[in-house]
Amino acid sequence: RDFWFDAEKIAQAERIAFNRWGYDRIVLGPNTRGIVEALGGTFIYPEDGIPYIESPYITDYGILDRMEPVNVKKNHRIQVFAQAADILSKEAENLVPLEASIGGPFTIASNLRGVEYLLRDCRKKPEEVHRLLEIITQTQMSCIEMAAEYGMGIAMADPVANPALIGPKMYEEFVFPYTKQLTDYTVKKTGKKVSLHMCGNTYSIWKYLVQYELNELSLDNIIDLQRAVEEIGNQIPIAGNVDPVQVVMNGTKEEIDRAVAACIQTGEKA
């Protein structure tokens, strides 16, 4: 639990992990949880377990009348991650890139409102959903400004915004404009493009994803990597695609090596 609230321990955990595995970037928060909390939501943090949302914060859209975008420089919750970034930016300079994860606007909205209610509201109360997404996006832009101060890039993930839950038309209306605004703003403020991970079967929204300012699009392992290479590989860098459970978590070293090599062999054609 301390990992989420103590800047020194966040930095220590990331330092230990990097020294052990030597991966190609260090990703810090605030992520979806930190931004949800900054906007008023509440998570439960088990002593040893994955945090989970206590209950939706927005039970009535009247709350938006008093909700404002967060200035992260004045927000204690976000400043924990800023302090960790300050520590690691000095240690990691010229060694490994740092990124700040800022979640995705639609997923943050789902945490504040509740997934079921948010999806219903997209049909019945679209104006209110847009009001909420504007506040979230402005808050994420403040996080981007913070990241820029430490020379960090930006990572995003928007799992609720996948076609298993919303169709392409809904994605175009409620996700694309805000994500496009964020990726454009990231380049403007940091000089770096965004790392984006999208869960699920995303074929139907590829035409939107390729319009973002991305240094990589990380695809779910259920995606046909060969098809991705052929259809969008010349428009955007592709990453991911190794099964995180069956291979990375439960597989042997040899199985992991084979899976990674297969992805590289397919992806190098892009």
Would you name each region that the model predicts?
Residues 6, 57-63, 75, 252:
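Intrinsic-disorder/low-complexity, polar/charged segments
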Residues 1, 17, 24, 28, ...:
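Active-site loop segments of alpha/beta catalytic cores
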Residues 14-43:
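Glycine-rich, N-terminal phosphate-binding loop and its surrounding beta-alpha-beta segment
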